[in-house]
From Swiss-Prot:
Substrate binds at residue 84. Residues 1-105 form the Tyrosine-protein phosphatase domain. It comes from the Eukaryota. Coiled coil: none annotated. Belongs to the protein-tyrosine phosphatase family. Its EC number is 3.1.3.48. The keyword Transferase does not apply. It holds the Pfam family Y_phosphatase. GO terms for molecular function: protein tyrosine phosphatase activity. Gene3D superfamilies: Protein tyrosine phosphatase superfamily (3.90.190.10). The gene is STY-12. Signal peptide: none annotated. This is Tyrosine-protein phosphatase 12.
Length: 105
């Protein structure tokens, strides 16, 4: 969250799932839909969660303890259909993801 705050990142694209075939593939670094997470000096809350086919778009509001009057919004685009091994069978959803991100940013 520090890098997102310092560089004022507006979008994150995630291509892996947290768990695949019963194995942990990455850490879930974001809070759930109605949760608020504390990460050191940062507080992160999910303010929107929308499913767009095989893509989940989550919006997070980030605040910093030292800057109480400043908040930042970052959008995570989570592509949920990348297989554990190999590549997706078609490219249509990946191009859809690319189109969505480019349209919004």
């Amino acid at each position: 969250w520090r890098m997102i705050w310092e560089k004022r990142v507006e979008a994150i694209v995630m291509l892996t799932n947290v768990d695949e075939n019963g194995r942990r593939k990455c850490e879930k670094y974001w809070p759930g839909d109605t949760e608020r997470g504390s990460h050191g000096e940062f507080e992160v809350s999910c303010i929107d969660n929308t499913t767009l086919g095989q893509i989940i778009r989550r919006k997070f509001k980030i605040s910093h303890q030292s800057y109480p009057n400043r908040t930042q919004v970052v959008v995570q685009y989570h592509y949920t259909a990348w297989p554990d091994h190999g590549v997706p069978q078609t490219t249509s959803e990946l191009f859809n993801l690319r189109r969505i991100v480019r349209t919004e940013f």
